[in-house]
Amino acid sequence: MTLFSSISSISNPMTSSKSSIASFGSGTSMSSNSNACGGGCGGGNGGILGLGLGLGLNLFGGSRSRGACGGNNGGSGNPGNGPFSGGSCCGSPCCGI
């Protein structure tokens, strides 16, 4: 289980207005073959919880939570539909898989 937090000034894609928020930024993996990523990496569309806080939380076995990079739809490996989906996460390819 990995956990990291970050505070960043991000642009919220829901309102298209910049705001400095404390992103929850929890990249948490709860299944053995999942890849948790996200948290303060641009806001995304709220991840699977729809909070708009860059939450990358994986509760589904085998799925990959894209977190701030677009959000997982809850299925196994479903791509996010946010502005950051398919891109990189803080410069690393964890969300581009």
UniProtKB/Swiss-Prot annotation:
GO BP: sorocarp development
Annotated stretches, region: Disordered: 1-33
Pfam families: Coiled
Source domain of life: Eukaryota
Family the entry assigns: Belongs to the hssA/B family.
Protein name as it appears in the record: HssA/B-like protein 47
Organism, scientific name: Dictyostelium discoideum
Organism lineage string: Eukaryota, Amoebozoa, Evosea, Eumycetozoa, Dictyostelia
Gene name tied to this protein: hssl47
